[in-house]
Each structure stands twice: as structure tokens, then as C-alpha cells.
Design a protein with these regions (language model features):
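Core alpha/beta nucleotide-donor-binding catalytic domains of modification enzymes
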Residues: 1-25, 29-204
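Short, surface-exposed loop/turn segments at secondary-structure junctions
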Residues: 185-189, 212-215, 278
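Internal, active-site/partner-interface "lid" segment
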Residues: 188-189, 193, 216-226
Length: 446
């Protein structure tokens, strides 16, 4: 089985020589198997590993026992580990989300923090074929498009999934044969929550009455559809670049494209400005209609504005240029400026907003001379987890922020930009597990 995982890693180029891979280690069987397999491949494939464990604040004493187990396991293998705690039930209530939704976002935030702590460049998670089948089936019943039916990718950004080639049964057999101890989460066997119901009730029913090889069939379908999706996205990227102009995209060029390619062009444009996460099918439809609208027409979608400007369609945050000014930042309410409103509210530690026009930061790290002002020559910005600072102008260029969107009010201390709409917060004020005064900063345009 280790050989299969090794071949899967090589086939999908998940790990390269010299990589440092952070393993998301819950202590459950899947993550323990992942740790054991990757540990055995370290020398052969020339990479190193470390681990991270997050106590979700859900299962009381059992969760503390899991954390102790992970600590002891990492000590046994001589692996450095990073631990953390989060009150996910409270976070879910604050956001109006389910435990699943809140937990997933915070879990990946935590893993990114641990990755930065260790200087790792990959994060390995223990999703397997049964998880893949669940995801595909869940997207299917929710009416997903082709992208959702592809399931989870072996690699997306710095997240890798080396066990997607194995079934749950194969992992359990491996744990038994290798005599590996692991923790059992009793809540996984309670048919509450969408995924648990799917895992415990729906999939067994479909396997029993329709297709005993349901998991394998769904995973094979996902792989085939992924090839189609990849090809369509390549075409869309080429067409989007061909339509790219200064400040936007050629409306006429986009309007000539077939609907499957056009919708992917729009998703790619939204992704460039960090506004794809909450974009739904209805938003894509509205943007397609906007292509034929009069100049100056504008619509708002979560995290962005889209508007027409003569022959162009523009994606970003629609603003008007303002003169130079500065004013103090209110840390417990709203601050009105010429360019828009800054709103500061308490937030949960480890919270992460869904666009680059808001950020959760450590208010205790704000310098005494912090203020809101227009950008100035000589300003510098140090993006979170970046190796160093750079000129603000270069940061805007790297983020592909159109010129007309670079004069939003920013927050600064001297020449150091602490928060810039479209870029997010600076390294110097980022949250960590020890932060005591977490606040959310939002910029709301006029």
C-alpha cells in the first residue's frame, strides 16, 4: 500500500525533493496512517515532515486526550508538533454557520499558521476515496456544476492529499497490519450533520441496493470529469488573457465565447481579485448579462463590484479618486472617510474574512500613531507570511489590482502600511494562537 501512495505522490507531483510537509494530525486512524506512510517515505523521496493538531473545543475531555495522544505519537517518531485550541461552537454561533462549516475554515487557517511556524511548504491532509465519494455525492445532490462533481483535487495550492488513492477499508487494514494505535471520534458514528448522514445512511443504502462499488465508481467519475474541467479551464484562461486590457477585459471579445468557456473566464477574473469564494451561479449569470449593458452599469456581488466602462468590463471595488488626507482610526466602531467607511468589531481568534477588503488582526499590535490616510510615495507593505516588505506600488502590481483601485483609504503607521483594501493585513499585526484582542477590520466603499 505504501508503494501505491508513493506512485500516487509521484504521478501527481505532490511532493518534491527538499520539501517540508506539515501533516494535519487529528489522531484519528486516517491521519495516523498518513503520518506513518509519509514517515516511511521521507528518506526515499527526500523530504521532511512535521505535524499540527487543533483541539476544536467540541468533545471536552476526549479532545484533550486526543491532543495528548498526538503529542506522545510525535515524540515517539521524533517529529516536531504544533498544537492549538479553538472554540468552534462559539465561532459557529457568531457566524451563523454549522460546526462543519466553521470548523473547516478555522482548521485550514490553523494549518496555514502552523506551516508558517515550521517554514513548511506543503500541508498534507488525510482525505481518502470514501471522503472523495462523499464530497462528489454531496455536490451532486446540491446541484453543483462540473467543477463540484470533480471532487477534491490531489493538490490545490499548498494542500496535498496523498491518500486519495486508498479506500477507508484499505486504511483500516493498514492500521491493523502495522499495529498502529489511533483515536476514535465517537461523534463520527452519530447520524447528525450532513456528512455523517451521508456516510452512515445514504452511501450504505446506495451500495447495498444499487452499486456495491459506488465509492470506486464515483471516484473514477470524478477523475474523468477533472480532465474535462482542466481542459475547459485552460481554454478559458487563454481567452481571458486575450481579452485582457488595461483596467479590465474587452466585453465584445468575452461576449463571443461559448457559455461554458465564458462562465469559467468570469470565475477566473473573480479569483484574481479574491472574490470567487462566495460567487454563486446567480452571480455569474448577472455578470454575463452585464456584458451587454450600457457603460457605467454596475452590480455588487460578495467581496467585489463588477461594472462596465465603455468597451471594458471591470472587476474589483468601484471608487472615485480622492485628495490627500488622514484621520485617526476608531478601534471600537466606525470611521467615516472620504473614500468609504472603516468598521472595527471584535472577532474570534483565528477568524478569517472571506475577501481581501477585510481582515482579522491583533489590535494590541497596532502602533500608537496608527491612522487612516491616502497612499503616499515611499509606502511599504509586508504581506502576511511573506519573506519581507516591498513597495506598496509593487504589492498592488503583484496582486494585479487595477490602477483605479489603488487609492482606497489605507491604515498605516508612518510609511508602514498595516492594512490596504485589496491586499489585506500586514505581517506585523496578524493574529496568532496567543492573541487576546482580536478585531475585524472591514472597509466599506461609498
Amino acid at each position: 500500500m505504501r508503494e501505491r501512495v508513493e506512485q500516487y505522490i509521484l504521478q501527481h507531483e505532490l511532493i518534491s525533493p527538499g520539501d517540508k510537509v506539515l501533516i494535519g494530525l487529528s489522531g484519528g486512524g486516517d491521519s495516523v496512517a498518513l503520518l506513518h506512510i509519509l514517515k516511511s517515505l521521507c528518506t526515499r523521496l527526500d523530504f521532511t515532515i512535521c505535524a499540527a493538531h487543533l483541539n476544536h473545543g467540541i468533545r471536552g475531555e476526549a479532545a484533550h486526550e486526543d491532543a495528548e495522544f498526538v503529542h506522545d505519537l510525535c515524540d515517539f517518531y521524533g517529529i516536531r508538533a504544533y498544537g492549538g485550541y479553538a472554540d468552534i461552537p462559539r465561532l459557529a454561533r457568531q457566524r451563523g454557520e454549522t460546526l462543519e462549516q466553521a470548523g473547516r475554515m478555522l482548521r485550514y487557517d490553523f494549518l496555514e499558521e502552523a506551516k508558517a511556524f515550521f517554514g513548511a511548504n506543503k500541508i498534507a491532509v488525510a482525505h481518502h476515496m470514501d471522503d472523495q465519494a462523499e464530497s462528489i455525492l454531496l455536490h451532486l445532490v446540491r446541484g453543483s456544476g462540473l467543477r463540484g462533481l470533480c471532487g477534491m483535487a490531489p493538490r490545490r495550492g499548498d494542500i496535498i492529499r496523498p491518500l486519495l488513492c486508498l479506500s477507508k477499508a484499505e486504511i483500516e487494514s493498514y492500521l491493523t497490519n502495522e499495529n498502529l494505535p489511533y483515536c476514535t471520534d465517537a461523534t463520527n458514528f452519530i447520524a447528525e450533520g450532513t456528512r455523517n448522514k451521508l456516510r452512515l445512511e445514504t452511501i450504505p443504502y446506495l451500495k447495498r441496493d444499487f452499486n456495491p462499488r459506488l465509492v470506486e465508481s464515483l471516484c473514477a467519475m470524478g477523475e474523468m470529469l477533472s480532465e474535462d474541467e482542466s481542459y475547459l479551464c485552460q481554454i478559458a484562461e487563454r481567452e481571458l488573457n486575450a481579452a485582457r486590457r488595461e483596467g479590465g477585459f474587452d466585453r465584445a471579445a468575452l461576449n463571443k465565447l461559448p457559455r461554458p468557456i465564458l462562465s469559467r473566464c468570469i470565475r477566473a477574473a473573480l479569483s484574481e481579485i479574491g472574490a470567487l469564494t462566495d460567487a454563486e451561479r446567480g452571480h455569474i449569470d448577472s455578470i454575463i448579462k452585464l456584458l451587454s449593458a450600457r457603460t457605467g452599469a454596475r452590480i455588487e456581488i460578495p467581496g467585489a463590484d463588477v461594472w462596465t466602462s465603455y468597451e471594458l468590463i471591470c472587476f474589483g471595488h468601484y471608487i472615485k479618486q480622492t485628495g490627500e488626507w488622514e484621520q485617526p482610526l476608531c478601534l471600537n466602531g466606525e470611521t467615516e472617510t472620504e473614500a468609504g467607511t472603516y468598521r472595527v468589531t471584535p472577532c474570534a481568534a483565528m477568524d478569517r474574512p472571506r475577501d481581501r477588503y477585510s481582515a482579522c488582526i491583533d489590535a494590541d499590535k497596532l502602533p500608537a500613531d496608527t491612522l487612516i490616510r491616502q497612499r503616499r510615495a515611499g509606502d511599504r507593505f509586508h504581506r502576511i507570511n511573506a519573506p519581507g516588505s516591498k513597495k506598496l506600488k509593487d504589492a498592488y502590481i503583484d496582486a494585479k489590482l487595477p490602477r483605479e483601485k489603488r487609492d482606497l483609504a489605507l491604515i498605516a503607521s508612518g510609511r508602514d502600511v498595516l492594512f490596504a483594501p485589496g491586499l489585506g493585513a500586514a505581517e506585523s499585526i496578524k493574529l496568532n494562537v496567543n492573541s487576546k484582542n482580536a478585531v475585524k477590520i472591514e472597509f466599506i466603499q461609498k
